[in-house]
Amino acid sequence: MNKTVFALSMLACTAPVAAQDISAYMPGEGEGIVYFLPKTTLKVNIIATRISYKPGDLCQYANQYLRMNNVSSEPETYWEIKRVEVCSAGVPDSTKAYIIKLKDKSAMGNVELTNEGLIKAINTSAPEEKAEEYVLEKPQKHENPRKYMTEDILIAGSTAKMAELTAKEIYNIRESKNLILRGQADTMPKDGASLQLIIDNLDKQEKALTQLFAGITAREDKVFTAYITPEEGLENKVVLRFSNLLGVLPANDLAGEPIYISLKSLAPIPVMPEDKKKKKLEGAIYNIPGKGKVTVSYQGKTCFEGELPITQFGSTEVLVDDLFKKINTHVIFNPETGSILKIDKD
């Protein structure tokens, strides 16, 4: 059946069709353009941050010389949940396959489908779908502190002496910045741009040398995705698990604590009676999605709560064939829900 769908979808995108009679698809029914309406799957994205700490070479002297408390001398790596997002995604519904048969008394033209056979547009081209993008935190490059060590620091005979001299250099850098900012330096920058350049360079030196005491903390975001099929009465289903040491884990990995998802139908659209469903479908069939309230929680706290379109909670309707007689009607569908986004007439 899939081969038929893809072959016919290519036909739809390249060759105009004079007219159509749309009906539920049955294999072997004859020539035509087969398309699917989507059903909803919930896409759960968990953005987690991996935090790695590497102690500095002079960490044991951090409190003594720089009054920095609680500086660890042990490397550490752990994870945090940054945020959770849930969105609706459409996948072909095998129970909603339709065929557009050719006939002579309609002005319906090209039919555009997705690669999966979902309907996108009739008599026009659907706009390009924007890819899902997240601004993720990435590890920053750190300056090599040895670039800013004085000769006295480099030839120091002991770690303790090196720590003492490095701390003095840090205080000298701070004093230089203060003198410049107060306008008390022997040689002042000529303009604001020069001033900023000097301050930025002094900040870079101070940060690099301070890392010898405070250590380096690197943060990196990762996106973990799980898919859930919506169903009425979905409550506290384990979608993924999370461990501070291991990060985001599959739902069946008991090394992490569960992340739960719940779904509640909101004002579902009445389902069409069976006798009306059996009526001949004359026109383009599309979805009217219902709505669902989605909640994701972890350790008793809500991480995400929102309303999303759910096709399983809605119904289907027919865009009557009369719209395509004698006039050119353009229709754009939402391939994620199968609903109509826009209708234009020439």
What role is predicted for each listed range?
Residues T4-T14:
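Sec-dependent N-terminal signal peptides
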Residues A15-A19:
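Sec/Tat signal peptide C-region and signal peptidase I cleavage site
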Residues Q20-D346:
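N-terminal amphipathic/basic membrane-interacting segments and domains
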